[in-house]
């Protein structure tokens, strides 16, 4: 995926959270946090949508962080309907700032796929409420936010939403409802299902376009 990939951990609210760091070839110009789908349905940091987004971020000079949520791999704890997972990701943001202080003021990207989109959206809202550093780009792919929403949300107007036309897990109408509620544009990939089989190149191109100009943002 990149010149260098390493494994590490940080302390979440229920114990150890493991994550993978994908480094760009040069010194990173920023970083990305990419969140995986439902832990109880096979979702891991190695999901192909997660790795596709992370790879695209790395190719744009970002250091990409791919955590395993509670109960996945070596991460401690049990599935918590996005509540505990969001709290863990707040701890992750703090961990990144402490571990890589040179990136504390750099642009960063927050992306989530399926269940990960629910954590990403609520993490953004939690950070905003606490006046913490907000991501420069927010991406919600296969948006399942309302299935796991536990708090009010206010999404930035430049949020990137991507959905498959024939999503069999989260119907397109569900993504449209979320987009309508928050007055966001929604990018639909024709003939794509939830896992974007055969459409990863197009997905990567859409993410790449959204990342354009990030370093100067």
Where would I find each of the regions flagged by the language model?
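Catalytic histidine-centered segment of alpha/beta-hydrolase-like enzymes
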Residues: 77, 192-204
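Active-site nucleophile loop of the alpha/beta-hydrolase fold
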Residues: 37-38, 139-148
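Serine-hydrolase catalytic machinery in alpha/beta-hydrolase-like enzymes
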Residues: 10, 16-103
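Short beta-strand/loop motif that positions the catalytic acidic residue
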Residues: 155, 160-163, 167
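Gly/Ala-rich beta-loop-alpha elbow adjacent to hydrolase catalytic centers
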Residues: 112-120
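Short alpha-helix in the alpha/beta-hydrolase fold that links the catalytic acid
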Residues: 171-179
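Acidic catalytic loop of the alpha/beta-hydrolase fold
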Residues: 165-170, 194
């Amino acid at each position: 995926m990149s010149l260098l990939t390493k494994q590490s951990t940080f302390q979440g609210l229920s114990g150890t959270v493991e994550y993978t760091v994908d480094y760009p070839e040069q010194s990173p110009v920023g970083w990305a946090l990419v969140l995986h789908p439902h832990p109880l349905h096979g979702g891991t940091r190695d999901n192909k949508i997660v790795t596709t987004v992370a790879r695209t971020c790395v190719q744009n000079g970002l250091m990409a962080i791919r955590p395993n949520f509670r109960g996945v791999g070596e991460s401690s704890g049990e599935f918590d309907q996005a509540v505990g997972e969001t709290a863990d990701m707040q701890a992750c943001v703090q961990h990144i700032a402490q571990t890589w202080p040179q990136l504390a003021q750099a642009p960063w990207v927050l992306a989530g796929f399926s269940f990960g989109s629910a954590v990403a959206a609520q993490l953004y809202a939690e950070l905003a409420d606490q006046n913490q550093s907000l991501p420069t780009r927010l991406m919600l792919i296969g948006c399942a936010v309302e299935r796991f929403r536990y708090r009010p949300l206010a999404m930035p107007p430049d949020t990137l939403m991507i959905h498959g036309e024939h999503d069999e897990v989260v119907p397109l109408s569900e993504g449209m409802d979320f987009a309508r509620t928050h007055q966001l544009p929604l990018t639909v990939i024709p003939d794509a299902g939830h896992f974007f089989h055969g459409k990863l190149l197009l997905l990567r191109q859409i993410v790449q376009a959204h990342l354009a100009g990030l370093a100067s943002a």
